[in-house]
Design a protein with these regions (language model features):
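Extreme N-terminal starter segment of soluble prokaryotic enzymes
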Residues: 2-3
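Acetyl-CoA-dependent GNAT
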Residues: 6-12, 16-96, 102-111, 144-146, ...
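A short, structure-level motif marking secondary-structure boundaries and short turns
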Residues: 34-35, 114-115, 121
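C-terminal "cap" of GNAT-fold acetyltransferases
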Residues: 61, 84, 117-130, 135-136, ...
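Helix N-cap/coil-helix junction residues
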Residues: 100-101, 138
Length: 165
């Protein structure tokens, strides 16, 4: 059984490790191993993750197993217009198919109750993620070139409209 809670500073090393593993597994076949490693090391450095925790516009969640190990992580950011972007949702490969990713997504949505929609960016070719988000009500609204600054790799912007309470 996993418990989802708000991320703390103590979670930073494990989250950094999980993100590195998840990125390498997911994106190496799409972006190449070298590019994936470079981007992941830049984006998921512990000091960067710790700084994000201090940013009031961002909310981060972790899913912890009963033994205390990290099973998943999600982070969403709200811009100055009140629009929310799901920046990250990653789970340990061993958790695929368990419903954990859906639970993390629900935690993010619950934390942002009352917003009209939530968006995300996914690299074209990440078919597993695209299928997951479609299953959970997201639709492609835009295609962008140079996903994550990588020329020749497009990304899809997906959005889910949310019921207003």
């Amino acid at each position: 059984m996993t418990q989802i809670r708000t991320m703390t500073e103590q979670d930073v090393p494990a989250v950094s490790l999980l993100l590195g593993q998840s990125w390498r597994y997911t994106y190496s076949p799409i972006l190449g191993a070298e590019t994936t490693a470079r981007l992941s090391d830049e984006k998921h450095a512990p000091e960067r993750l710790a700084a994000e925790l201090r940013d009031d516009s961002k909310m981060s969640f972790v899913a912890k197993r009963a033994d205390g190990s990290l099973a998943g992580y999600a982070m969403a950011a709200m811009d100055d217009k009140g629009e929310v972007m799901l920046e990250r949702l990653h789970i340990d490969k061993g958790e695929y198919g368990t419903g954990l990713a859906a639970d993390l997504l629900l935690a993010v949505l619950a934390a942002h109750a009352g917003i009209p929609s939530i968006a995300l960016e996914v690299i074209e070719g990440n078919d597993r993620a695209i299928a997951f988000y479609r299953k959970h009500g997201f639709e492609v609204v835009e295609r962008r070139e140079a996903a994550h600054g990588v020329e020749g790799r497009a990304s899809l912007i997906m959005r889910r409209l949310l019921p207003m309470a």
